[in-house]
Amino acid sequence: MNGAVPMLAIDGPSGAGKGTVAGLLARRLGWNLLDSGALYRLLAFAAVNHGVDLTNEEALKVLAAHLDVQFVAADGSHGQRIILEGEEVTDVIRTEQVGAGASQVAALPAVRDALLQRQRAFLEAPGLVADGRDMGTVVFPDAPLKIFLTASAEERARRRYLQLKAKGADVDQSALLEEIRERDERDSQRAVAPLKPADDAILLDSTEMSIEAVVETIIRHCERQGWDV
């Protein structure tokens, strides 16, 4: 890892607000942004489009290595537009169905290996904010600042419910809660790169915090690193 480039790793479970927080921090700091979860969502989405079974590890490995994807800076909660094979898929890949597929393919060792260098390539000047589930433990283990952002499963389900309702979706909050609990178990129990805080990560529980408060808290930690914020 390029130690001369400032690096902030944000990990945490599904629905903790990592993507929104990372996007806001990247804009605030003027840094590059890596939404690693989007890569796994893109792979699951592309696999379905190309008729690749989500359990076919070898085929998924090949697809992961050749994903034709572009991340374009933009306004909005995620801070970027995502272009896959020439078509914008920014919102399409955010569905619960694609998320479940992403969690499934992310458990495959060959897939994680195929995407590892692709993720590390995002580390460029002036700095990088990376969010995911193994940023501080596997992808960027030497990151000088690591945040593990979490919230109760109930609060994460509530946030997701409000988010989906705002988009006009017909959703059941209790079903969302069950899905979140199942995904937490799957992500934390997988054999490769399980979801867990890095030993040197700062734990931040956002259950009772606003997005703005979370961002400001992390900014204070950035200041302690001596970074220009």
UniProtKB/Swiss-Prot annotation:
Its EC number is 2.7.4.25. It catalyses: CMP + ATP = CDP + ADP; dCMP + ATP = dCDP + ADP. Pfam families: Cytidylate_kin (PF02224). CDD domains: CMPK. It is found in: Cytoplasm. GO terms for cellular component: cytosol. This is Cytidylate kinase. It comes from Pseudomonas aeruginosa (strain LESB58). The lineage of its organism: Bacteria, Pseudomonadati, Pseudomonadota, Gammaproteobacteria, Pseudomonadales.
